[in-house]
């Protein structure tokens, strides 16, 4: 219900029609939303900026350029955006900016539809807030209640969680709400699909009346708009279509490998091709990244590797080496498939096909950034053919068998 900052200019802001007409409203970005092209010009605290760059972000995505400043101003915000647009970092950066670290009480509450997403949000907050000494807890079902209570008693600046468990903790008075300044509803449409409507309303009733509300949703069905009417004061609207990553100019190939073990030999055969410019090799798990890195090194190939479990400092120096061109081949997980620009990368290898098709464009859409041409090679086992065809269909693209002269194409 944050309406204090900048609620002037009724004419500037097209008034929303009556609620029942909302379905016909072409949801568009409010007129007063300006674009802030860099993280440096957002007025963020120094220790947060360090965390943002250390995490590997260089330039804010479309939603980050528009929403962060509005949220920091204290405005209620409705952002319509799909996953893959940088939405999580948008509210995470905003939340971290608004915290008073000296006060060991919960100041921001983030609700998410799944345990996995809540944990992902918590990890992202801890990574971005690495230099701020931020305390952040994931409050999710299926875990030990006693552990939750202990963590909350210790004092957490931010709590991310699923509505059921969060409400349970509020009811038990383990999660104190008096210092909460901001409520974030991530993937709000998904939460409603999962039947969390009652719990969200229950949680909301316990929050201080002036709590700022940020709602993120890929779709805006009637129930969501009903919720925004109840929870929000004069919200700013931001519509972000999915990142305009393109597969144009990127030649995509697959290599059929009968067995998992043969992927390694295929990679070794390709190594000389990899080092023509710079290459990123994607695996689906951290363990696989570590295993492949070790195996490549044992075979006397020079590679560097990175994933979310490595200490921040280590990741920073690996990224620095890779950016400078000192290391040519980087093995990584999807943590790095977003928000990273290394212009020299013109070859991507999917050692494992991504777990979901949206990640595909994040992995390889990057290799053609700045209008550069790129090549993507997918290692495909027999049972992956289905996934590959699905990716082709989803992106209306064509993935051919890799030719012998692939080096000439890079």
From Swiss-Prot:
Protein name: Eukaryotic initiation factor 4A-III
Amino acids binding ATP: 59, 64, 81-89, 341, 366-370
Positions of the UniProt region annotated as Disordered: 1-20
Gene3D superfamilies: P-loop containing nucleotide triphosphate hydrolases (3.40.50.300)
Record's function text: ATP-dependent RNA helicase. Involved in pre-mRNA splicing as component of the spliceosome. Core component of the splicing-dependent multiprotein exon junction complex (EJC) deposited at splice junctions on mRNAs. The EJC is a dynamic structure consisting of core proteins and several peripheral nuclear and cytoplasmic associated factors that join the complex only transiently either during EJC assembly or during subsequent mRNA metabolism.
Domain Helicase C-terminal: 249-410
Gene Ontology terms: biological process: embryonic cranial skeleton morphogenesis; mRNA splicing, via spliceosome; mRNA transport; negative regulation of translation; nuclear-transcribed mRNA catabolic process, nonsense-mediated decay; positive regulation of translation; regulation of alternative mRNA splicing, via spliceosome; regulation of nuclear-transcribed mRNA catabolic process, nonsense-mediated decay
């Amino acid at each position: 219900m944050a309406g204090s900052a900048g609620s002037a200019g009724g004419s500037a802001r097209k008034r929303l029609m009556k609620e029942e007409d909302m379905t016909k409203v072409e949801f568009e970005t409010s007129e007063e939303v300006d674009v802030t092209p860099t993280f440096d010009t957002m007025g963020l605290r120094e220790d947060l900026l360090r965390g943002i760059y250390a995490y590997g972000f260089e330039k804010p995505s479309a939603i980050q350029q528009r929403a962060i400043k509005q949220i920091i101003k204290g405005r209620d915000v409705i952002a319509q955006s799909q996953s893959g647009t940088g939405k999580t970092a948008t509210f995470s950066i905003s939340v971290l900016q608004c915290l008073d670290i000296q006060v060991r009480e919960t100041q921001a509450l983030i609700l998410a539809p799944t345990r996995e997403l809540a944990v992902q949000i918590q990890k992202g907050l801890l990574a971005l807030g690495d230099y701020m000494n931020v305390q952040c807890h994931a409050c999710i079902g299926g875990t030990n209640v006693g552990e939750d209570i202990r963590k909350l008693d210790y004092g957490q600046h931010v709590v991310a969680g699923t509505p059921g468990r969060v409400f349970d903790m509020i009811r038990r008075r383990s999660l104190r709400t008096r210092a909460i300044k901001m409520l974030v509803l991530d993937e709000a449409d998904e939460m409603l699909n999962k039947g969390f409507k009652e719990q969200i309303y229950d949680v909301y009733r316990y929050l201080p009346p002036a709590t700022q509300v940020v709602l993120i949703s890929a779709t805006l069905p009637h129930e969501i708009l009903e919720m925004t009417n109840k929870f929000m004061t004069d919200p700013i609207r931001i519509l972000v279509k999915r990142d305009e990553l393109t597969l144009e100019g990127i030649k995509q190939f697959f290599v059929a490998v009968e067995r998992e073990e043969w992927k390694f030999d295929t990679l070794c055969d390709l190594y000389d091709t990899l080092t023509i410019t710079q290459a990123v090799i994607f695996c689906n798990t951290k363990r696989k990244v570590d295993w492949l890195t070790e195996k490549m090194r044992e075979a006397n190939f020079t590679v560097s590797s990175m994933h979310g479990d490595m200490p921040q400092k280590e990741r920073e120096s690996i990224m620095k080496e890779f950016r400078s061109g000192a290391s040519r081949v980087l093995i990584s997980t999807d943590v790095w498939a977003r928000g990273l620009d290394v212009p020299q990368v013109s070859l991507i290898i999917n050692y494992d096909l991504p777990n979901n098709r949206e990640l595909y464009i994040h992995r390889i859409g990057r290799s053609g950034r700045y209008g550069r041409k790129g090549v993507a090679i997918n290692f495909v086992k027999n049972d992956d053919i289905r996934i590959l065809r699905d990716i082709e269909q989803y992106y209306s693209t064509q993935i051919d068998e890799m030719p012998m002269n692939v080096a000439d194409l890079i």
